[in-house]
Amino acid sequence: IKGSKAAPVEKVSVEQLLPKLENTAFRIEEQPYGSLFQLYKNEFLYQSVSKGLITPENLALAGDGTPVITSHRERKHRICDCALNGITDCKCDRYFSQPDCDIGWDSSRDCWYHGYDLYMLVASDSESDLPVFPLLSPASTHDSHGFLHTFFRMRSFLPDYTVSKVLLDSAHDAMPYYQY
């Protein structure tokens, strides 16, 4: 049905994932995007805070995922000589130029795509829903999991930010969210 959400492919439930991530201490230095986040934080986020556009001591967040299409097919090439020997359907290993990408469902366009899921937490009480914390995940990441990964990383990397309320859509409709 057009506009419907894809079923989660994760093997772990929200109920299992939430306490695991809540008790994980993420270190920005260990993240592949660490230097990019530091640049974002210093040049954009802190500027928004200093101008009074975002209030980190009483933050209302909205969160949602959006597709980031990187190609129309998997980017891979053979590392074997099978094609030279006339074997076209070998099962040999391949080299993937974007190994952290995969296939996901875009419910707003009603199609599959190859790439990432950008989960964005924004300041819903700011004039323009200014971004607070973005996180790229493989395209197959369901929003219910994308939020948890993004939220708990945000808490680790921005410890002085106090979240007062969170606005999420129906993809996040799981009892552990309400209980948290």
Report the location of each language-model feature.
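Polybasic low-complexity intrinsically disordered regions
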Residues: 2-170, 175-178
